[in-house]
């Protein structure tokens, strides 16, 4: 299982970026931004599973990433990769971190999102 801390460490090492927390109302929502233009390339949120149409109790961490529509359609499986929560559902996906194992795959999706949002 990949954690938000794993992602923060990865993006710091790979892109030199650190999360920021733009919403006082949601202090654990962490945006991942380009240092040059401040555009988001990722957003980590803690949400209730039912907000995503999932079963479960207690908040879960999700990672929103930008993704080309032709790829996001293939990735979405209704369990751990979903249409982007509170984002353009065609171009963004939400990844349920606790239900996702292959960190290499997630890191590849982060890299793709990083380049798509430059």
Curated annotation (Swiss-Prot):
Entries under InterPro entries matching the protein: YjbR, YjbR-like_sf
Disulfide bonds: none
Top-rank taxon, per record: Bacteria
Protein name: Uncharacterized protein YyaQ
Naturally occurring in which organism (per UniProt): Bacillus subtilis (strain 168)
Gene that produces this protein: yyaQ
């Amino acid at each position: 299982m990949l954690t938000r801390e794993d992602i923060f460490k990865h993006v710091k090492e790979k892109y030199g970026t650190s999360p920021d927390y733009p919403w006082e109302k949601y202090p654990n929502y962490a945006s991942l931004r380009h240092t040059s233009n401040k555009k988001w390339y990722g957003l980590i949120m803690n949400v209730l599973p039912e907000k995503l149409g999932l079963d479960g109790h207690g908040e879960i961490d999700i990672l929103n990433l930008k993704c080309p529509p032709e790829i996001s359609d293939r990735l979405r499986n209704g369990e751990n990769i979903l249409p982007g929560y509170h984002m353009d559902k065609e171009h963004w996906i939400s990844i349920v971190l606790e239900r996702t194992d292959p960190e290499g795959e997630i890191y590849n999706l982060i890299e793709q999102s990083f380049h798509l949002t430059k």
